[in-house]
Amino acid sequence: MSVPNSPEAPWAVGQLNDQVKNWIQRLGFIWVEGQVTQVNMKSTWRFSYITLRDVNLEASVSLTVETSALKNLATPVKDGDRIVVHGKPSFYSKRGSFSLWVTEIRQVGIGQLLAQIEQLKKAMFAEGLFDPRLKTPLPFLPTTVGLITGRGSAAERDVMEVAKRRWPAVRFRVINTAVQGPKTVPQVVDALQELERDSAVDVIIVARGGGSVEDLLPFSEETLVREVSRLRTPVVSAIGHEPDNPLLDYVADVRAATPTDAAKTVVPDVVQELRIISEARQRGAGALRNWVAHERKGLAQIRTRPVMADPSLPVARQQDIIAEALQRKDRALGVHVRSLRSSIESLKAQVNALGPSQTLARGYSIVQVIPRDKSGAQVVTTVDQVTPGSQLRIRVPDGSITAAAMGVQAAPGGVMNKNSNTTDSTDNTENGTGEA
């Protein structure tokens, strides 16, 4: 039955613990899997205490087990072991503490663990965490190398000695962690995060000098693998175990077979690099010498040309070409001008031959009628322009004659102007106009 609870009627601590105990006891017996991180056992104790942690999360639970049950196990339980326990959750209301009362312990065999790792590897492959396109290339010459390894381990010594021998100026930031057992994953993850935050670190090496399959299980934990996949700083895995590679080898940007190989992969050899530079300089110097020799040969060939013996020769040659071109221009222009003059004279002769002055010179005259309003005189081209009494101007070669029309007579077959006087037309025409 639910106990009322309100600001006016709060629970006492004992009531709270009793309620929690009732809720927990409803769970009944359950199976739980985890990794042993601590075992407190004495032969004189009736009960022993084990801390069991989640292999993927930062979570743990206390186990209470009879000491006799632990002694009867075929293999003693130790830190780092994977176990499956059967028990009932229990809550101690007086202390407010939780524990799992264990009635059975089963140790997880290595075969089963490897099967779980293989299943996890397939899942991560499908997820794309091991895609080569996600790999970050290593820097050519890192200034600072982050190193995660066991304190005072041979792996730490090998990496630093080889790296310093290859490139003495390289710097290291070393973080020592557990490299086997239940503390490995959380400590390595913390170290990775710390080095990732350090902007001076160009590459991270995770190194361990080999070990048994059981010792290397932490480097296949999902938590560690996913943390490495999130890093932007390139990671080199140097766990050093063949042929069963931990999952860290697959997610890392580069895998090295040993810590020594990791140092060789990350840090270039100064002697080799100097040799490469020296060879490149020699090739460059040789290429430059060949180029200079080739250019000198070409310059020598140019110097042997006649033009180089007398530098003014090309100028004189061009002057001759220009003078000849000017002469051709003058000749062509003279011919063209003479042709135009000849054409003008011919046209002038034609104009003169057809002009009025030449006509007058041949005995003809030009008759113009002068209107009564004294406007411009008009050349007479038809009898219709003249009436008896019209004032006429007759032009002859040496002057002009002013006359008056006595009469007008049309040519035979022509039409006579109705105003014309035909009586004296013959005499007037002969005496007044001459030839027209």
Curated annotation (Swiss-Prot):
Catalytic activity: Exonucleolytic cleavage in either 5'- to 3'- or 3'- to 5'-direction to yield nucleoside 5'-phosphates
Main location: cytoplasm
Record carries keyword Cytoplasm: yes
Region (Disordered): 412-436
GO cellular component entries: cytoplasm; exodeoxyribonuclease VII complex
GO process annotations (BP): DNA catabolic process
Keyword terms of this UniProt record: Cytoplasm, Exonuclease, Hydrolase, Nuclease
Record-linked InterPro entries: Exonuc_VII_L, Exonuc_VII_lsu_C, OB-fold_nuc-bd_dom
Signal peptide from the UniProt entry: none
Biased composition (Low complexity): 417-436
Protein location: Cytoplasm
Molecular function (Gene Ontology), one example: nucleic acid binding
Top EC category: hydrolase
EC number of this enzyme: 3.1.11.6
Family, as annotated: Belongs to the XseA family.
Cross-referenced HAMAP family: Exonuc_7_L (MF_00378)
Purpose: Bidirectionally degrades single-stranded DNA into large acid-insoluble oligonucleotides, which are then degraded further into small acid-soluble oligonucleotides.
Subunit structure, as described in the record: Heterooligomer composed of large and small subunits.
Protein name, as recorded: Exodeoxyribonuclease 7 large subunit
Organism: Corynebacterium jeikeium (strain K411)
